[in-house]
């Protein structure tokens, strides 16, 4: 197997044993990008000069046996809404074209401290608003498993790059499923941690009460290794949780005999494709064969997840995106002749169609006369959804179900049909609304397109999710498939 398809864990061993230099790994990755990414279109910007320089510095440390850091010499790709000091961060939007940050996000500081090597910034839906990566102003990323299909979104570039062997891990952000859905579509492992587990400082805000940064990898243990590196409380983020336990690998490999798993009947109901249902039912039988106890439960407010999510997320977006006014930074209209025109024209020209749609929706939901009917009611529904999960977790350790109701759809198929596009978030938005951790792992394929299995856990119990996901992965995975793509 080429270095480009090696796991994070194996690369760490090869580097530690001095069988390969960090600079060799980085060179192999850039060769892979040059060969493959003109087709996949996952990267928006490369940081080649700095990456090679950093790798050469790590070579010197390797020679001195000073290989400090959990990710020493490991290449990484970062979603383009995560601030990177000195490297353009655009959120795949005209509004931020040419914007080069002068500070570092907390997750990037942590990864640099662990001696990971930044390869470049990855494509996404504009300002993380979309489910296919087609709203990007720059390019349309394709699914490595089927180039006619979308990679999912909004972290489509992050998922596609990992699946195609262009980086061993990437970071994405998940507001309503934006890590887990593309992970499912691209056949990789994607974790949305508990809200507050990972600092949001330096994440360009979409919906601040929902956003969470998380890792995408080709296997479960790699995912746990990366989450350990980026987790922890942060004084720069008042919503980060003061939780000391960031050990996610110690229970990987432990069996799941007696583990109580809940299967909500709503997760295999209306709107879920037959091929997805079959794959999930097969996965449930696998879990039973591993000793887990799987029982059907009800999460009755699941159907209200999408409408409440889109009201809340759009309302928060309309507030967060008000900072892009054409004055301080970002796109500045050249046609304006007054301050009012500058505001209007900069935002009209700088934002894409989907972003403007959500700003309009959010502004309407927060407006006088409609606040109680839409925003306030959506927050009440959010509480009901959280209560549903709390009730289930009184008796069960994890919840299982599909990640997405279908496999990846074709490029161009849903981009002009927002309601159909939004329906793809049926099974992921409730997890964000409740602030819970969720992980997607591959569980099958249909017509060559991957199917994702989602495990949902109790708050700050990512350790159990990794444990059950790892055991399932021993029975089904796509490790032998990636290189054939």
From Swiss-Prot:
Coiled-coil ranges per UniProt: none
InterPro entries: Amidase (IPR000120), Amidase_CS (IPR020556), Amidase_dom (IPR023631), AS_sf (IPR036928), GatA (IPR004412)
Active site residues according to the UniProt entry: 79 (charge relay system), 154 (charge relay system), 178 (acyl-ester intermediate)
Protein family membership: Belongs to the amidase family. GatA subfamily.
Subunit structure as annotated in this protein's UniProt entry: Heterotrimer of A, B and C subunits.
NCBIfam families in alphabetical order: gatA (TIGR00132)
Chain's role: Allows the formation of correctly charged Gln-tRNA(Gln) through the transamidation of misacylated Glu-tRNA(Gln) in organisms which lack glutaminyl-tRNA synthetase. The reaction takes place in the presence of glutamine and ATP through an activated gamma-phospho-Glu-tRNA(Gln).
The name this protein goes by in its record: Glutamyl-tRNA(Gln) amidotransferase subunit A
Annotated source species: Staphylococcus aureus
